Amino acid sequence: MRIFTGSIIMLATASLSMAQTTPQVGAAAPEVTLPSNEGKPISLTDYRGKWVVLYFYPKDFTSGCTSEAQSFQRDLPKFNKADAVILGVSVDNSQSHKNFCAKERLNFKLLADTDAKISEAYGSVKEYNGAKLSARNTFIINPEGKIARVFTGVKPQTHSEEVLQALAELKKS
């Protein structure tokens, strides 16, 4: 019982510290410059003037991550119509992202955060068996480069629709 209680306290503490480092709505989005699935570095500033959906996910080729990526791909025409760019981020390398994009026919960029520094800057890191992974969180960044909406602990199958709805609301205000 003592070990179980200690584990719960550790998990609560880890969640609390992650929540404290997650950028808040209205804050400037931490800069991102990472290699993409195409091998070229991509910066968040490359998309200034556009809405950006920056979504973090744990691992290429896993069921939840594949489902989430497929949902974003399915809705890509709607995001394009809303003048929004989708950028996925995980700790996988560029080659893994390239293979994942090819297999799943993804037409948006995936960024390789192999040292998890960008994931950390966005409060989107979790540990699994001693390895750092990106946590499943999403940030909508407005055309001025500020955080407009934060989603944590998302459901991969329905998340794309949730983001589209939030984007439509944000663009109205």
Where is each model-derived feature located?
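Short active-site neighborhood of thiol/selenol oxidoreductases, capturing the structured segment around
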Residues: 45-66
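A short beta-strand-turn-helix
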Residues: 23, 32-51
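Short loop/turn microsegments at loop-to-beta-strand junctions
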Residues: 29-30, 51, 135-137
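Structural microenvironment flanking redox-active thiols in thiol-disulfide oxidoreductases
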Residues: 64-106, 114-118
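N-proximal helix/coil linker or "cap" segments that precede and/or mark the start of modular domains
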Residues: 3-31
